[in-house]
Amino acid sequence: MAYTLPELGYAYDALEPHFDAKTMEIHHSKHHQAYINNANAALEAHPELLEKCPGALIKDLSQVPAEKRIAVRNNVGGHVNHTLFWKGLKTGTTLQGALKEAIERDFGSVEAFQSEFEKAATTRVGSGWAWLVLEEGKLAVVSTANQDNPLMGKEVAGVSGYPILVLDVWEHAYYLNYQNRRPDFIKAFWNVVNWDEAARRFEEKVATCGCAK
């Protein structure tokens, strides 16, 4: 069963003025779709791998034939990352409860967490992602290059952990609206974080990868 583009669950202009509608439309319908197309092409001869949860597939790339591994890492990784990103966006939610308590425990304050997250997102050279992850019961901020995901583990991605929150810092995520002002885009992110989804991922520690095919 081939991967398909997941619905956002909200309109392209739902995150205005922080994330503009044109960027959201192109990012979702063009960029994400391209990763899906490439992932399906890479796995066309391996339907048994297409049946797996994409998150479970990238968590153990040794399942993938060596000649397809880079394509799967980049394109299934891109599919998983973008799906998590879309689910993590919403206006009007509030950080509270167990996740807020854990952030204050592990970073000292919400403000200190935000500062560390912004630094990780700002200093990621080139294309990549900033993440809040849960590893061995503790929250941490990490960043990955290209379409790597902490689920891939340290040997592949250089970092590891279970994704709670993620921000795309590829230029295509912000350039139409923010041009070279990546720090402004990162600041705007706090206005559209879906804290309810982040809390769900933290509290339930869901076993599935959280992404649709």
UniProtKB/Swiss-Prot annotation:
Keyword Manganese set for record: yes
Residues at which Mn(2+) binds: 27, 82, 168, 172
Keyword entries, A-Z: Manganese, Metal-binding, Oxidoreductase
Cofactor, free-text remark: Binds 1 Mn(2+) ion per subunit.
Gene3D superfamilies linked: Fe,Mn superoxide dismutase (SOD) domain, Iron/manganese superoxide dismutase, C-terminal domain
PROSITE patterns, per the entry: SOD_MN (PS00088)
InterPro entries (UniProt xref): Mn/Fe_SOD, Mn/Fe_SOD_BS, Mn/Fe_SOD_C, Mn/Fe_SOD_N, Mn/Fe_SOD_N_sf, SOD_C_sf
E.C. number: 1.15.1.1
Molecular function per GO: metal ion binding; superoxide dismutase activity
Pfam annotation, one family: Sod_Fe_C
Top-tier EC class: oxidoreductase
GO cellular component terms given for this protein: cytoplasm
Entry annotated with the keyword Signal: no
Catalyses which reaction(s): 2 superoxide + 2 H(+) = H2O2 + O2
Cofactor: Mn(2+)
UniProt signal peptide: none
Role description: Destroys superoxide anion radicals which are normally produced within the cells and which are toxic to biological systems.
Family membership: Belongs to the iron/manganese superoxide dismutase family.
Quaternary organization: Homodimer.
Name the record gives this protein: Superoxide dismutase [Mn]
Organism (species): Mannheimia haemolytica
